[in-house]
Amino acid sequence: MKGRAMSVFTRHQVIEKNSILLVIGILLVIAIGGMVEIGPLFYLKSTIEKVEGMRPYTPLELAGRNIYVREGCYLCHSQMIRPLRDEVERYGHFSLAAESMYDHPFQWGSKRTGPDLARVGSKYSDEWHVTHLMDPRSIVPQSVMPGYPFLATSDLDYTSIAAHLRANRKVGVPYTDEQIEHAVDDLRAQVNPDEPKVAEFQKRYPKAAVRDFDGNPGRITEMDALVGYLQMLGTLVDFKLYDDKANLR
């Protein structure tokens, strides 16, 4: 047995000492691995799971997402729960490709100085988010997150929100002409439950929350937009109805 092992090792030395054979071997292994991993994708119509409930962002949520990107939140927070036991037990169901199919660019992140935010929606109250964004250490004394108090005093500039929807449609987000046309009205309606056009807004964006998010009625701030975006994350797919096996291929 020992002699056989030595014989295999001796034969392998021939490859190690011959650079051409070594390169050929490396390329062969890469080719096999590529066929195993990439090949099946050519037979799939889509790599996105079939789920119920996903919809494009509302104008307010899209404005909040733009602020999220602008302030670099993705540098410290991920939006990607991996299928590992510790992550699933802490954050919830692992992330689905369908949940980020309308993100351009996606917000999966690459670093977790802070917790993952993929399912932060409805986990805390609006007041909690406002307080945390204004002064993180008032909630978590050990936090290294900077404060964003200016969001509460900065009026949201939504004059070009229709153009943002139109730009997203060009990269594949299925916004309709009606949604683009009423973008400004829909943004105003989402933060004001007394707005006459709330019913029309909810028809265009099912399950969208309608309320004043920053606790400052009568004024639409950047805080409204960011909190509205955060409160939506991870809430669109009902995992009580989601069937993992239906997406097996």
Predicted regions and their residues:
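A generic secondary-structure signal for well-formed alpha-helical elements
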Residues: 39-46, 71-75, 80-84, 136-137, ...
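Electrostatic cytochrome c docking/interface patches
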Residues: 45-69, 81-84, 88, 113, ...
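Electron-transfer interface patches adjacent to heme c in soluble/periplasmic c-type cytochromes
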Residues: 22-31, 89-222
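Sequence context of c-type cytochrome heme-c attachment sites
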Residues: 40-54, 59-63, 78, 94-107
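Surface-exposed patches in mature extracellular/periplasmic domains of secreted proteins
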Residues: 76, 142-148, 237-246
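Long, low-complexity, intrinsically disordered N-terminal extensions of eukaryotic proteins, enriched
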Residues: 2, 6-13, 86-93, 99-102
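Post-cleavage N-terminal segment of exported redox proteins
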Residues: 2-57, 193-201, 229-249
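The canonical Cys-X-X-Cys-His
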Residues: 64, 70-80, 129, 226-230
